[in-house]
């Protein structure tokens, strides 16, 4: 909250990304944020393999596939900030492995799932007894609609947290409406 007669300049994000293919079936991406509110962060560093049509596998540091809004980069946001759900639980990057299948014909959908360390970007040297998982399905009945269902299990410390998310959006030219619901359940092991 600002006080009267206060002001500032801020570079909120200054991202630099390099991506491409080293082979027709092998791609890479590296993305760094040179100014995430003043600090430098490595965001993505992964390799993606496309063994057959519509299927890919990704290994490295990436955004965890969860929620409808989390995969949008700052330049793709509809508002100045992320949605509350994406900001609080969906804006997670981690080191892991994902598989993704995309169906473009008939009833289009995208199904993506992965296993992750669960330690985020900062504590990658830790050893884990439990991996986190995330599964996300996007149903695309036509070009204007998107229904996204996802689930994620994380285990910080000794508490298991299961999250279930459902989101839907409709867009047509300059109109976009979106709604999302998240259910979070805590358990102990």
PLM regions and their residue ranges:
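Detector for outer-membrane/organellar transmembrane beta-barrel domains
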Residues: 128, 138-189
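Outer-membrane beta-barrel proteins
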Residues: 39-41, 66-71, 122-124, 156-160, ...
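Outer membrane beta-barrel
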Residues: 1-118, 129-131, 137-146
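Flexible, active-site-proximal loop/turn residues at the rims of small-molecule/cofactor binding pockets
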Residues: 22, 119, 181, 185
């Amino acid at each position: 909250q600002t006080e009267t007669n206060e002001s500032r300049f801020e570079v909120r994000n200054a991202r630099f990304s390099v991506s491409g293919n080293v082979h027709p079936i092998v791609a890479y991406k590296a993305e760094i944020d040179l100014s995430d509110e003043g600090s430098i962060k490595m965001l993505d560093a992964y390799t993606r393999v496309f063994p057959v049509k519509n299927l890919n596998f990704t290994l490295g540091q990436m955004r965890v596939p969860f929620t409808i809004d989390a995969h949008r980069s700052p330049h793709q946001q509809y508002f100045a900030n992320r949605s509350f759900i994406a900001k609080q639980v969906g804006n997670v990057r981690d080191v892991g492995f994902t598989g993704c299948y995309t169906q473009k014909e008939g009833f289009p959908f995208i199904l993506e799932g992965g296993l992750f360390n669960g330690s985020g970007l900062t504590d990658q040297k830790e050893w884990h007894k439990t991996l986190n998982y995330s599964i996300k399905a996007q149903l695309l009945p036509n070009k204007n609609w998107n229904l996204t269902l996802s689930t994620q299990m994380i285990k910080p410390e000794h508490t298991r947290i299961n999250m279930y998310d459902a989101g839907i959006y409709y867009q047509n030219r300059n109109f976009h409406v979106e709604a999302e619901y998240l259910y979070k359940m805590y358990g102990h092991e």
